[in-house]
Regions:
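Short amphipathic helix-loop junctions that connect adjacent transmembrane helices
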Residues: 40-53, 243-258
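Pair of pore-lining "gating" transmembrane helices in MFS-fold secondary transporters
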Residues: 14-47, 118, 220-241
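Cytoplasmic helix-loop-helix junction between adjacent transmembrane helices
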Residues: 114-153
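C-terminal ends and interior cores of transmembrane alpha-helices
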Residues: 92-107
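C-terminal membrane-cytosol helix-exit motif in multi-pass small-molecule transporters
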Residues: 161, 165-167, 185-206
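Helix-loop junctions at membrane interfaces in 12-TM secondary transporters
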Residues: 18, 103-115
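Juxtamembrane intracellular "pre-TM" segments in multi-pass secondary transporters
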Residues: 3-18, 198-229
Length: 261
C-alpha cells in the first residue's frame, strides 16, 4: 500500500536517490537515442530494401506498433518483478534491434528489418517508463525535479542519436547504416549496464497481484479519453512529419547529414 511504499522510499538514503536519478537520466540519454536512429534511417533503409517503394515507411509503422504493443507487457513485468527487471528486458530488446537491423542490411532483407523495428518499438515502450521510475524512486518533495532531469535526458538523446547516425553511417562502406545499427546495439547494452545499478522500491503485494482499478473502469473516464485523443493526434502529427522527412530530404538533394539533424 501507499504507506509501505513510502517506508521503502524513506529507507533509501539521499545518495541512493540521487544515484537513481543520475542513472535514469543517463539511461534516458542513451536509450532514447534508439528512437532518433530509427526515425533518421528507417524510411531510407526501408526504401532501399522494400520490394515495393510504397512500403518504404512501413518499418516506422511497425516501430509504432511495437511501441504500442509493448506498453502493457512492460507494465506487467514491472508490476510483477520490479522496474529494474522491466528495464533490463527493454534494453535487451534494444540490443536485439541493433543486431537484427544490421543483419537485415547485410542480407538486404526488408521483412527482417521490419522485425528489427518492432523490437525497437518495444524498447521505446520501456524507455517511456523511465520518467515514472524517477518519480517512484524519490521522496514526494523531489519528484518534480527528478522528472525534469530525466526528461532533460530525452533532449540529449535526440542529439546523441543524430550524431550516432552521422558518425557511423559510412564506417562499413559497402553497407550504409550497418555500423550505425551495431553502434545502436552497443549503446543499448551500455544503457543496460547503467540501469543494473538502480535501486527502486519493489512492487507492493497489491501491485504485484494486480490490485487497483480495472482497466475497463479507467478507459471510461473522460480524462483518460481526452488524454488518449490528445496523444493520438499529437503522435500522428509527429510521425507524419518525421517518418517521411529524411527520405524526402534525400530525394530532394539534401545530404544525409542534414536529414539526420
Amino acid at each position: 500500500d501507499f504507506s509501505s511504499k513510502n517506508d521503502e522510499l524513506t529507507a533509501l538514503s539521499p545518495s541512493v536517490q540521487r544515484g537513481n536519478i543520475i542513472r535514469l537520466t543517463t539511461a534516458q540519454a542513451l536509450a532514447g537515442a534508439n528512437t532518433t536512429v530509427i526515425f533518421a534511417t528507417g524510411s531510407i533503409v526501408g526504401n532501399a530494401l522494400a520490394p515495393d517503394k510504397s512500403l518504404a515507411t512501413l518499418p516506422i509503422t511497425i516501430f509504432v506498433i511495437g511501441m504500442a504493443m509493448g506498453i502493457l507487457p512492460t507494465g506487467a513485468i514491472a508490476r510483477r518483478y520490479g522496474r529494474r527487471t522491466s528495464f533490463l528486458v527493454g534494453t535487451s530488446c534494444g540490443v536485439i534491434t541493433g543486431l537484427l537491423a544490421t543483419l537485415a542490411v547485410l542480407m538486404s532483407s526488408f521483412w527482417l528489418y521490419c522485425l528489427a523495428t518492432f523490437f525497437g518499438g518495444a524498447y521505446t515502450a520501456v524507455v517511456l517508463s523511465f520518467r515514472f521510475a524517477a518519480a517512484d524512486g524519490v521522496e514526494a518533495a523531489k519528484k518534480a525535479r527528478a522528472l525534469s532531469f530525466v526528461m532533460g535526458g530525452g533532449v540529449v538523446a535526440g542529439i546523441v542519436g543524430a550524431h550516432l547516425v552521422t558518425y557511423t553511417m559510412h564506417l562499413w562502406s559497402s553497407y550504409m547504416f550497418a555500423a550505425t545499427y551495431l553502434a545502436q546495439a552497443a549503446v543499448a547494452a551500455l544503457s543496460a549496464l547503467v540501469l543494473m545499478g538502480i535501486k527502486l522500491p519493489m512492487p507492493t503485494v497489491e501491485e504485484a497481484t494486480g490490485g487497483g482499478r480495472p482497466l475497463s473502469l479507467i478507459i471510461r473516464q473522460p480524462l483518460f479519453i481526452t488524454a488518449v485523443i490528445c496523444g493520438a493526434v499529437s503522435y500522428s502529427l509527429m510521425n507524419f512529419l518525421m517518418t517521411a522527412a529524411p527520405l524526402g530530404m534525400k530525394m530532394g538533394g539534401h545530404s544525409q547529414e542534414s536529414s539526420n539533424l
